[in-house]
Amino acid sequence: MNTHGFTLVREEQLSEVSGTVKLWRHEATGAELLSVLNGDENKCFGATFRTPPKDSTGVAHILEHSVLCGSEKYPVKEPFVELLKGSLQTFLNAFTFPDKTCYPVASANLQDFYNLVDVYLDAVFFPRIDEKCFQQEGWHIEADSAEGPLRYKGVVYNEMKGVYSSPDSVLAEHSQQSLFPDMTYGLDSGGNPEVIPQLTYKAFKAFHESHYHPSNTRFFFWGDDPEERRFALLAPYLSRFTARETDSAVPLQPRLDVPRQLEFPYAAGEDGDKGHVALNWLTCETADTGELLVLEMLEHILLGLPGSPLRKALIESGLGEDLTGSGLETDLRQTFFSVGLRSIVPGTAEDVEMLIMETLADLAENGVPAAAVEAAVNSVEFDLRENNSGRFPRGLAAMIRSLATWLYDGDPIAPLAWEKPLAALKARLASGEKVFEDAIRRWFLDNEHRSTVILTPDANLAAEREAAEAAKLQRLYDALSDDDHKELVALTEALRASQQAPDSPEALAAIPSLTLGDLPRENTPIPKTEDTAGDLAVLAHDIDTSGILYAEILFPLDAVPAELLPLVPLMGRSLTEMGTSKRNFVELGTLLASKTGGMDASPLVATLRGARTPVAKLCLGGKATADKADDLFALMAEVLTDADFDNRQRFTQMVLEERARLEQSLIPSGHGTVITRLRAAYSLSGRISEALGGVTYLEAIRALSDRVVSDWDSVRADLEILRGLILNRQDAVLNLTADAKTLAAAQPYAAALGRALPTAFSVPLPLDPLGAPINEALLVPAQVNYVGKGCNIYDLGYNWHGSAHVITRHLRMGWLWDQVRVQGGAYGAFCSLDRMSGTLAQVSYRDPNVEKTLATYDATADYLRKLDLSDRDLTLAIVGAIGDLDTYLLPDARGAASLARHLTDDRDDLRQQMREEILGTTRRHFTEFAEVMAEAARAGTVCVLGGSAAENAATAHGWNISKVL
């Protein structure tokens, strides 16, 4: 069978993807296409190139950014951004892996999907990639004047500076490289900031020429779109190429016969005295799908639960505070396993290594408990059947899975067809074969291809790196002639002029986009009924969930005093991680994994529409197959009514884990920390969120880590107070998502859960008013900054209108993108508006600047005043806003979204009104919003998380300074 030059190689019906999978080969070029035909309306496409680098200059990563900066058919500066501005896309991005670069798109709108695919195809095969693009996205030297200092700039350069500021990222990179010393995985495909400036434009261009060819491409389609059109989209591009050999093969790393130990410094704070260690093993090839499934289950057995033997041994050892390491890494040709401890005392790495090996030896010798095996099998099988890819489209998850073999010229269908390997593994286990004990010996105990990677703290490293970079640039400056200096200034000015020059109307018109007429005028409501069961208020959502029941029960936090709020997240964790009077935490975790798809508790905070009062809940959520609904509700009742808070050692471990997790996430997620901090200054719900997950929470957890040692009785008493204040039937809400039959069958179990809850009454406490906001710098040992400025626009007199969503989205994708990312060199910038509370924040991500970015924020009003918005730009902004409103949600997320709307009184009629206001947005709304942004500039509050640049700005302006790491 041949169509559009493609020949069918293989076809299979796969229940695992609910459809047909076809492998096609393009005869003229050798390009392969994996075409999945099923009923998923969230259509997905991807083009993947094998791109193993030969150095750590980040060439593949910089090229990934750059091909999306203009192409032959779409000659605008950033078609990627134009698509983001005005598409109904459900996914639009690109990824650089150690050996491949992927360009995936997804949309539930057919015409929009075709538009995205065409722009991406032109981008990857016929990109502009001129020298200015390379300088902007990769690196360049910036000089404002012939006498002034030189600076390295570039989006990827600053992105990777941020990566190398995170100890977790550094440890992960060194762990991978330590196992692959002889091939491409021993390099950094993302780019090492110290090496990136060695990349030349010539080498950059050559990499595209050699790797971005159909002969080196794997195409992927997924969804309910007609297959014939898939070929028609690809054919015009492939017709311009002929087959050729591409030097992109990824070899196997030869097996090492001697373990390695490597030690590296990392940038710690002034008080940082803790190290990190990871033990790493090279394991099987991804082509061995049966063995890979064994390793996935073994990972769950060893680490998947709080009471898993290796996790438990490491945490209870007291050698560190939390696990580190990626576990099983499956994105490369050869998999590897990594596990270790964060925050160890320097010099104790060998103790950690010995403990890991002894624990594994004990399991191999004495056997893996049968209950742990059952839990692992159930958990892995549940995940496979649920196919819950979260924020990623299911098609994208399938594409990544297929590439595990396909990229290396293996069978792309095998990783998708998991039913037979699963059945075979179950049969082996049923026969009594010691599958996991044998795997422990084979891959861990008898495997000499392993490494120990140690990170040691260095409080001077960040400053030394800055000084080394400054000295390098000074030497370069000193070596330049006067004419060279002038030329460098001219090049800087030319790049800025190019960045600031608008695209022509003709070029912009070439970008395909939807019209307002293509947009649905009505919102699609989520099914919801309200009822009671056992005196418990119940929300039910009749949605096809493929036989899975999702359940969440929520309890108000209104009666919790402010001083106890930071204890709520750990109290929630305690429900499922400390055991009950019937079973200890190991037994409870194993039972949960055997009977359900998971259960956990966490806070939920939002703002009530109109009243601007907080909605704060503790949410216990779980999921199970329909036939195990009784187990799900029985276990929910058990943890809610019988959780055991007496285990001091276990609770102390949880506190230390929480502290380590918070500290390690500060730098990688600095923008989130800044947004949370700004919202806390301007809304009561924001203040509660900060107490439950921000810097205030980190400070409270640090204090708690001392108190569990010095005054456990008071901590135990506080946990009991929280139990009494929170876990009762009063105002509790049960949220259920499943098909109608499953919902009906669950009613008796829901009623029993309601009856099991205490009937105590808690009195809501009045909330203290917000204090005066303060400008502040939060100092961390990072080479980049996260710069924020925020306010509450309702306090400034603004009344909500749906056009605000259109305007802030336009600012994010236009003004801030151009000024902060393109010209400023930051990795990203956001304009975040919470319509319920009124808090607005402009925040940057991995930003080399502070003052310049703040000046951009303050100039937003002037930008809006002068904005000459074309009809096209207005339409794009409206289309993009509707895309946000209609974001594609998997079944469980639809039920959760309906719950959130119910709790905040975000009614369907009001959401429809907002939709109409979005669709009716005009230029006048942009002009009027300029005055809101002018007030935001005048009255807003600054929060910057960063290193020396943040400290210098804070000192100059008299901001409050706090060292948080």
Identify what each model region corresponds to.
Residues 218, 227-245, 366, 446-449, ...:
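Extended, regular secondary-structure scaffolds
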Residues 142-235, 242-266, 271-273, 278:
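Hydrophobic, small-residue-rich alpha-helical packing segments that form membrane-like cores
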Residues 91, 205-209, 265-267, 324-329, ...:
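Generic recognition of flexible, low-complexity loop/linker segments
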Residues 42-52, 78-126, 133-142, 169-194, ...:
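M16 family metallopeptidases and their MPP-like homologs
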Residues 59, 63-67, 571:
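Active-site His/Glu-centered metal-binding helix of metallohydrolases
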